[in-house]
């Protein structure tokens, strides 16, 4: 049965490009077979899904062509082999009684270390002003945050930043903390979510450690509280935060708060807290425009040392909602796919990888639209594109148009052939393979094809 699979691989090698075959078919390993099923091993679940979606029908046809029999294909994901243990961990020896006092000293030291750690802010070092992309939608909040970081507790105290989920509020509060800490490593900075503040307060009440809790927060130089809206309706938490706020404000310490809403629009927030938030500066962050989203993608890809073509960045920016986290998730997914398959990122790859995420806000692409766009690009007539003339200035545009038709429409080979002057399906297949090969080996030619695709979606 393995011979059948080997012959099928040979068949597939003849109809697929070298890169496609080496990426998706060659890694498949024959594990065994039953009367009507062939079992193949795949490297990963991701690999299995891709091969199933794209090449399963082709694999079945290639196997059937060997002996005329149809087989089911069963995939098994290769198991990860656990690393062998190099050394057995020694068993803990019982400690002599004379070490008990020493253990007590160690416990005290641990408590002191714990206290020190509490003074170390859990800021994200990646969130800095340098890594933040400023644009019209967030410029005010960005400038206000920089002003606070450069001169804490001077003009804008408290600073209240509000905006929708995933627009950069958390990035800015971390950037403020990181900037102040870089200037003054001894600065006492506390960065908490409102939920964490509430949970810690509840535990302090439970274990009768409220004095420790209050002292911890009221000795800070900078208090950063994320998502203050989650304190709404929590009377005891708001009470404690109110007194903490007053103590820090009166000591001329900076307070920065974020929320998804303007203070007066947060239901369940006490009026006395609302009024205090309005003492300082309130800055909003709006959803970014396409240009800002493109700039964010380009900066992120540069940080990851990944080449992201302009047309791909535009495609992601236009297809994503205004949530920056969603945008970053798309980029990570695309980078992962490119890395796993060893391919360069292109617009066609992005469309394929993002097809379940991005519903393109464009009209349906038709063969006629592609013919018109290609003809305009090469300054020829559509009738010439559909003709049988074999001069190079017509053959190459014709093959490009056929390739894009196969890629962007649901038309079959015979249907495409009919639209190009009644050409047979073998001519259409030849054109597609010719363009695939040229794209793989000629960057300038690839850019031409990408440019035509881009015109179709703008």
Curated annotation (Swiss-Prot):
Binding residues annotated for ATP, in chain numbering: 166, 168-170
Q: A single GO CC term, please?
A: cytoplasm
Where does the secretion signal sit in this chain? none
Annotated region (Domain IV, binds dsDNA), positions in chain = 339-458
Q: Where is this region: Domain III, AAA+ region?
A: 122-338
- Annotated Basic and acidic residues bias: 80-119
Query: What ranges does the record give for the region Domain II, renumbered to this chain?
Result: 84-121
Where is the protein found, in the record's own terms? Cytoplasm
Q: Superkingdom, according to UniProt?
A: Bacteria
Statement: the UniProt record of this protein carries the keyword Transcription regulation: no
Task: Give an example GO biological process.
Answer: regulation of DNA replication
Q: Which SUPFAM superfamilies match?
A: P-loop containing nucleoside triphosphate hydrolases, TrpR-like
The principal location of this protein is cytoplasm
**Keyword terms:** ATP-binding, Cytoplasm, DNA replication, DNA-binding, Lipid-binding, Nucleotide-binding
According to the UniProt entry, its GO molecular function terms are: ATP binding; ATP hydrolysis activity; DNA replication origin binding; lipid binding
Q: Where is this region: Domain I, interacts with DnaA modulators?
A: 1-84
Which residues does the annotated region (Disordered) include?
A: 80-120
Q: What is known of its domains?
A: Domain I is involved in oligomerization and binding regulators, domain II is flexibile and of varying length in different bacteria, domain III forms the AAA+ region, while domain IV binds dsDNA.
The UniProt similarity line reads: Belongs to the DnaA family.
> What does this gene product do?
Plays an essential role in the initiation and regulation of chromosomal replication. ATP-DnaA binds to the origin of replication (oriC) to initiate formation of the DNA replication initiation complex once per cell cycle. Binds the DnaA box (a 9 base pair repeat at the origin) and separates the double-stranded (ds)DNA. Forms a right-handed helical filament on oriC DNA; dsDNA binds to the exterior of the filament while single-stranded (ss)DNA is stabiized in the filament's interior.
Question: Subunit structure, per the record?
Answer: Oligomerizes as a right-handed, spiral filament on DNA at oriC.
> What is the recorded name of this protein?
Chromosomal replication initiator protein DnaA
Q: What is the source species?
A: Citrifermentans bemidjiense (strain ATCC BAA-1014 / DSM 16622 / JCM 12645 / Bem) (Geobacter bemidjiensis)
Q: What is the lineage of its organism?
A: Bacteria, Pseudomonadati, Thermodesulfobacteriota, Desulfuromonadia, Geobacterales
Gene (UniProt): dnaA
